């Protein structure tokens, strides 16, 4: 199963927290000290906590669980999309719309509208419209794709959230908490770990660190899914006998 070593984390700068004046005292147990007024995260805590989170995500994906990757700030946006796509999972990488989980019924209607517009753009319907109407629909399609494209095939609520930057994505975490969906999150020294089921203390800004987390999670999810496919194949083989 995918694991991450301390050497990997040091190379990626996972240990660099935020400036000491921005700290959240709830993160004190995970802080090693400070250097040049920047908090240093204790990787002896982070390594086992991240690997424990990976093991749990592996189990969830082996049960066909759906994992929603959330990272809407610029540093994470593209990497979040790539990681989710690489393991056939789902993502929100632009703005988190309030109610995305807690008001799923309404979100589902918007997803239906998105899919209808996609069909219209491909089957020639747009060509039959006036230029103005076609432009309006194209804009609506782009807007919906931007906010819902990563979850349009999710088909229901996710079984877990993997979040880059607990502070930035606090609304998503709160919604998941309200619905009892487990939250796995990268929590920097300026963030509140409350509401996060699997806290991963680490830098949430450095692109190398963000890529390290996402790469490891995507790999562990792919492994979990292949275990699930292997057990399905085994079952059908037994039935055939």
From Swiss-Prot:
GO molecular function: structural constituent of ribosome
Gene3D superfamilies assigned: Glucose-6-phosphate isomerase like protein, domain 1 (3.40.50.10490), Helix hairpin bin (1.10.287.610)
GO (cellular component) term, any one: cytosolic small ribosomal subunit
Domain of life: Bacteria
Keyword annotations: Ribonucleoprotein, Ribosomal protein
Residues forming coiled coils: none
Disulphide linkage map: none
GO biological process: one example: translation
Entry's family note: Belongs to the universal ribosomal protein uS2 family.
PANTHER family: 30S RIBOSOMAL PROTEIN S2 PROKARYOTIC AND ORGANELLAR, SMALL RIBOSOMAL SUBUNIT PROTEIN US2M
Protein name in UniProt: Small ribosomal subunit protein uS2
Gene: rpsB
